[in-house]
């Protein structure tokens, strides 16, 4: 059983790696990132390709996820009714801020983007790729969530993710755990997180935690406003922060609890377990 569990863990690690960025990976890069032999990685990739979870680019030979996992995730997300219930609030925030509005949900010890609304119709429009996983130390959303956790837990999560190397994100990205701890103290004190040319050059963002269980509990999600730094002056920051916190409170008030699992939910979960077990065998 331990061997099977280990193989399943490797399978999930492989899937999570391929989901980090919207690009294809070469076999050697996957092997290096996972710390596994190329032969073991190739066997997993071959199994996942045969079941339709992964595909190999015919020209480069690189590997990437198919849309199958995204479709399954969307089905799970829709079952929570979160997109339907939060859409009007996110739309209102986008209309009032005239900037890009995004929402991310806490999944274990990470944040994942789940929704966005574009509030800017003309001029310079900020529209980044919606990569699933949110980088925690350099984003307003990441800091907004981490600030709601006990400091020791927040620092542990941050250390496990690691401080990004210089040049990977924006020019003002946090470069040490100590600097992140100070930023979380500021975020906790004012109730919202900020990123100013940290995630991307020329981009600023403000995010607030969504806390359905009360103001002193860990957030279950975050919502944010983001746009060019030229539209995030001192007065703009105050205004955006107020709008974002109001939206976060409104979402918290209607946050849906997951309803009882239906037969189709259980069948879907069973199918996934069976197919991953085959991939790991």
Regions inferred by a protein language model and the residue ranges of each:
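Extended hydrophobic
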Residues: 172-250, 267
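Short, structured helix-loop boundary elements
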Residues: 4-8, 27, 62, 66, ...
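Amphipathic alpha-helical effector-binding/dimerization core
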Residues: 60, 64-163
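N-terminal helix-turn-helix
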Residues: 1-84, 249-257, 278-279
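Amphipathic alpha-helical regulatory segments at dimerization interfaces
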Residues: 17, 33, 85-96, 102, ...
């Amino acid at each position: 059983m331990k061997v099977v569990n280990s193989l399943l863990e490797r399978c999930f690690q492989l899937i999570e790696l391929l989901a980090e960025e919207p690009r294809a990976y070469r076999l050697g890069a996957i092997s290096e990132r996972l710390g596994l032999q190329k032969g073991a990685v190739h066997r997993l990739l071959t199994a996942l390709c045969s079941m339709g979870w992964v595909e190999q680019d015919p020209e480069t030979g690189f590997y990437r996820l198919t849309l199958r996992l995204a479709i399954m995730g969307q089905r799970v997300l829709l079952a929570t009714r979160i997109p339907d219930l939060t859409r009007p609030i996110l739309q209102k925030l986008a209309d009032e801020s005239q900037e890009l509005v995004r929402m991310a949900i806490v999944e274990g010890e990470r944040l994942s983007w789940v929704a966005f609304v574009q509030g800017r119709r003309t001029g310079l429009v900020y529209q980044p790729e919606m990569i699933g996983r949110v980088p925690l130390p350099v984003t307003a959303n990441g800091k907004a969530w981490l600030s709601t956790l006990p400091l020791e837990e927040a620092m542990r999560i941050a250390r496990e993710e690691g401080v990004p190397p210089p040049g990977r994100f924006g020019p003002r990205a946090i470069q040490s755990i100590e600097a992140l701890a100070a930023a979380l103290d500021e975020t906790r004190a004012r109730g919202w997180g900020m990123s100013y040319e940290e995630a991307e050059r020329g981009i600023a963002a403000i995010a607030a935690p969504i806390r359905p269980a009360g103001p002193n509990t860990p957030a279950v999600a975050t919502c944010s406003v983001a746009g060019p730094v030229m539209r995030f002056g001192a007065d703009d920051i105050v205004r955006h922060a107020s709008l974002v916190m109001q939206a976060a409170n409104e979402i918290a008030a209607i946050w849906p609890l997951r309803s009882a699992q239906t037969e189709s939910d259980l069948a879907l979960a069973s199918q996934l377990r069976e197919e991953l077990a085959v991939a790991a065998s």
